[in-house]
Amino acid sequence: MQAYGKRQPKANVSSDSTAVADNEMSVMLKNITVTASRGVARKTPIAMSDVDRREVENKLGNNELPEMLNQTPGVYATKNSGAYGDSKLNMRGFQSSNVAVMVNGVPVNDMEHGGLYWSNWGGLGEMVRYMQTQRGLGASKVSVPSIGGTVNIVTKTTDSKRGGYATYSVGNDGFNHVSASFSTGLTKSGWNFSMLFGKKWGDGYIQGTDFTDYDYFFAVSKRLGQHHQIALTGFGSPQSHYQRNQYDGLSVEGWQDVKRFMGGKSVYRYNPTYGFGKNGERKSSAFNFYHKPQFSLNHIWLIDDKSSLNTALYMSIGHGYGNSGQGINSAYANSWYGAANGKLRYDFRHADGTFAYDQVQELNEQSDAGSKMVMAQSFNDHIWYGLLSTYTRQLAKGLDFYAGFDVRSYKGTHTAKISDLYNGAYYTDLRYRSSVNPANNAAALDPNWQYEKLSVGDVVFRDYDSHIVQHGVF
C-alpha cells in the first residue's frame, strides 16, 4: 500500500492486489487494482511456490533465470549445452512444451511446438518482481496445455518506486554486465514510468561460447478516474551467442578422449565445433542470433470492491536465425556435427581438437561441382498477437469466481539462406529440391530448378510459412 500525508491507516488488501494512491491528499486507498494473479503459499489449494525479488537478486549473478527455480520442488533447470541462454526447464518430469510460461500473465511458449528459448529473455532477471510456480494442473488464467505446471514471471511495473540505479559487475570467464534503471514513481497526476537498459557480454564457460546480449524494458501506466488504469509494457533482449550443439554430447568414454585437448581444464568445457577458417577467422556451425520483443497494453477496471475485469492486448515480433550446416548428401551434412553416438567425430578435426573449418574450405576449393558443404542461416521469424481478458468475482471469503477468454493469432516464416559457401564456387540443393511437391512450389515443375547454382543469400533446405489461430475459454 502507498499513502500520502503523515497518517497511514491500515487497509485490507488482497494478496493478488497492488494498491496505489488516488491523489496527493489521500491518506488511505479507496481503490484496489489487480495487476497479476498470485496465489498465497500454504493457503492456496494448489502445489505452488514463490521466488521473490530479493532471492533473485542474491542468486542470479551470471546464472540464468530458470536456475532460480532449482530449489522449487518438482522443478529441474539445467544449462543444457552450457551456452548462454540455452537453459532447459522441466517440471514434474515434463519438458517446457507441457509447462505454461507467462510474463505478466501473457503466454510466451512457442506457438508451434510449445517450447521456450530462454535466450530471448536474457535481461528479464533484472526486471523480475517475483516468480511463481504451480506444479501440475492449476489455476492459470490462460488456455494452454500445462499438465507439467505453470510459471508466471511478474515484472516491476506500476508498483515501482521513484529512484534509479546504475551497476557494473564482472564474473568468471569474462562475464561483464552493465545496466541502468530509473522510475518516476507514481506522480501527482497518476502517471508512473519505469525503464531499464543493460548489456551482458562474456566468453562463456564452455569453450568458444562467447555472447553479447542487450536488454531493455519500459512500463508506463496512468490512472483514469477512480476505477480504471491502463498500462503499456515492453521488453526485449536482442542477443547473439555461439553454442555447443545439443546433439554433440559425449559419452563418459568420449569425454575422457578429449582430455588431451584441454590442457588441464575440465573436459566438460570442451566444444567439438569450436574452430577457425584458413585465414584464422572464427567459424562455427552453432551460432544463434535472435530478437523477440514483446509489448502489452493492459486495461484494468475495478467494477466494485468485489469484482474486476483485466484485459491485455499483446504482440510479439520475432526475428533471428541459427546456423544450419548443409551438405550435398547426408554424409556431408552430418559432418558439420562435432560428435556422433557419444563419440568425437574426426572427419574434420585438427590435432589440437578444434574443428577443421579450413579443411572444409579446401574440400570445396578442390571440387569441380561447387561446394559440397555450406553454411546456412535458418531463420524463424514471426508475428504473434493476442487478447486475454479475465473477470474476477469474490463470491465469499475464500471463494472466488474466474472467467475469461484467450485469443491468439500467429504467423511464422521459416527460411534457410546460404551465408557462407566455404570457398566454393556455388551450391546445388538437389538433396531437398528433388523432393519438393509442385503443388507447394510451382518452380519444381522445371527440371533445371533442382540443379540451380546457388550463392550466398539463396534459399536452401526449407521455405514455408505457418499460420495458427488459437482461442479458448476458462
Segment roles from a protein language model:
Residues 221, 229-296, 323-377, 440-454:
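Acidic/polar loop-and-plug regions of large Gram-negative outer-membrane beta-barrel proteins
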Residues 30, 87, 149, 162-164, ...:
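Hydrophobic, lipid-facing positions within transmembrane beta-strands of outer-membrane proteins
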Residues 279-324, 371-406, 413-414, 458-474:
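Outer-membrane beta-barrel transmembrane strands
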Residues 39, 96, 108, 156, ...:
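Structural signature of outer-membrane beta-barrel domains
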Residues 163, 170-201, 206-245, 294-304:
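Transmembrane beta-barrel wall of Gram-negative outer-membrane proteins
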Residues 14-15, 26-60, 88, 96:
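N-terminal periplasmic "start-of-domain" segments of outer-membrane beta-barrel proteins
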Residues 88, 107-135, 154-156:
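Short acidic/polar hinge/loop motifs at secondary-structure boundaries
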Residues 66-107, 123, 129:
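Extracytoplasmic beta-strand/coil segments of soluble accessory domains associated
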